[in-house]
């Protein structure tokens, strides 16, 4: 009899990790802003909308075009230094609104030292780290 509440608890925990997608999340204003950068970076990198959606709403996966798309977004949002390395202070300063900034700060706590041989790989490392840290709120435009 004890196993049924445990199973329900495990199902509830798994469901709680599903990405939030509703009329207010991801924030419509951010999606609108992000479309501009998507329209710049997608053609530059050759990433597919399916790869972006799968990473955002589905499973973390490795795709070179997607990795470079993420790097392009960092450059377009101007959150990198002269060497192309991401600076979290710039990322946080680029995020509008205290609520969204706090969500990002919390998700970033364990995402400080990126791994990767290229800027594209480092960009992907940040994104997969954020998604693992907060799969409910993470989204990719």
UniProtKB/Swiss-Prot annotation:
Source domain of life: Eukaryota
Keywords: Disulfide bond, Secreted, Signal
Annotated compartments: Secreted
SUPFAM superfamilies recorded: Insect pheromone/odorant-binding proteins
InterPro entries: PBP/GOBP, PBP_GOBP_sf
GO biological process: sensory perception of chemical stimulus; sensory perception of smell
Keyword Repressor among record annotations: no
Listed GO CC annotations: extracellular region; extracellular space
Signal peptide start and end residues: 1-16
A Pfam family: PBP_GOBP
Family: Belongs to the PBP/GOBP family.
Listed PANTHER family: GENERAL ODORANT-BINDING PROTEIN 83A-RELATED (PTHR11857:SF45), ODORANT BINDING PROTEIN-RELATED (PTHR11857)
Protein name: Pheromone-binding protein-related protein 6
